[in-house]
């Protein structure tokens, strides 16, 4: 059996990096990726939704060119550049990962406003249950749509979810050309400084 077959049939989480085939990428549409979550995290990072590459391999922000893992490292959240396949190591430092919308698509543009709003409600319930100190939503457009905050900007938000502080960061996808790696790392560093206060 291949590693992929074992993963799909036994729910085993594969930690050895591998690259999906074109067929596996196409088959990943609509799939989900398990949350990396625990109660009382320092920060719960929240992507918009899994891309096809991420869903195919079963690990968050896995597509080559995604800047999430380099930004975490550059901002000092991790002591080394983690592979997406080592995502569970984040829990040791008090960090986790989830998504606003759980289903995988080729691009976030394929999500409807209803999906984002429903995802925002589901995420708020998850935050109330797990009680992270901070929720970092990675994508201002998704935050605006999911929480009906059309004028939201990057940074700390005025509202909280329960006692959880909400912070919005840019989408780290390589498809987001508005923010280069250095600017992204600086914005992640601002969150790190706030959490460490």
What kind of feature is each model-predicted range?
Residues 96-146:
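Internal catalytic-core helix/loop-beta-alpha segment
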Residues 32-38, 81-90, 126:
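Short amphipathic alpha-helices and their capping/turn segments at secondary-structure boundaries
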Residues 37, 42-48:
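Short, hydrophobic/glycine-enriched beta-strand segments
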Residues 49-53, 102-105, 141-143, 173-175:
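Short, solvent-exposed loop/turn segments at secondary-structure junctions
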Residues 54-57, 144-148, 178-179:
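Short glycine-/acidic-enriched loop or helix-start segments at secondary-structure transitions
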Residues 54-114:
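Short, surface-exposed acidic-centric catalytic microdomains
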Residues 4, 8-34, 38-39, 64, ...:
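C-terminal capping/extension of enzyme domains
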């Amino acid at each position: 059996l291949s590693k992929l077959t074992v993963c799909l049939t036994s729910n085993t989480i594969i930690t050895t990096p591998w690259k999906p085939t074109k067929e596996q990428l196409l088959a990943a549409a609509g799939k989900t990726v398990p949350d990396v979550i625990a109660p009382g995290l320092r920060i719960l990072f929240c992507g918009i939704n899994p891309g096809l590459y991420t869903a195919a391999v079963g690990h968050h922000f896995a597509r080559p060119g995604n800047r999430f893992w380099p930004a975490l490292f550059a901002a000092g959240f991790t002591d080394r550049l983690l592979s997406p396949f080592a995502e569970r190591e984040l829990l040791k430092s008090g960090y986790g990962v989830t998504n606003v919308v759980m289903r995988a698509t080729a691009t976030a543009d394929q999500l409807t406003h209803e999906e984002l709003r429903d995802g925002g409600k589901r995420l708020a319930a998850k935050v109330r249950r797990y009680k992270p100190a901070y929720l970092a939503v990675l994508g201002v457009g998704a935050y605006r749509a999911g929480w009906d905050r059309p004028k939201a900007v990057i940074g700390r938000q005025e509202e909280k979810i329960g006692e959880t502080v909400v912070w919005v960061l840019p989408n780290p996808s390589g498809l987001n050309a508005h923010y280069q790696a250095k600017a992204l790392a600086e914005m992640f560093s601002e969150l790190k400084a706030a959490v460490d206060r």
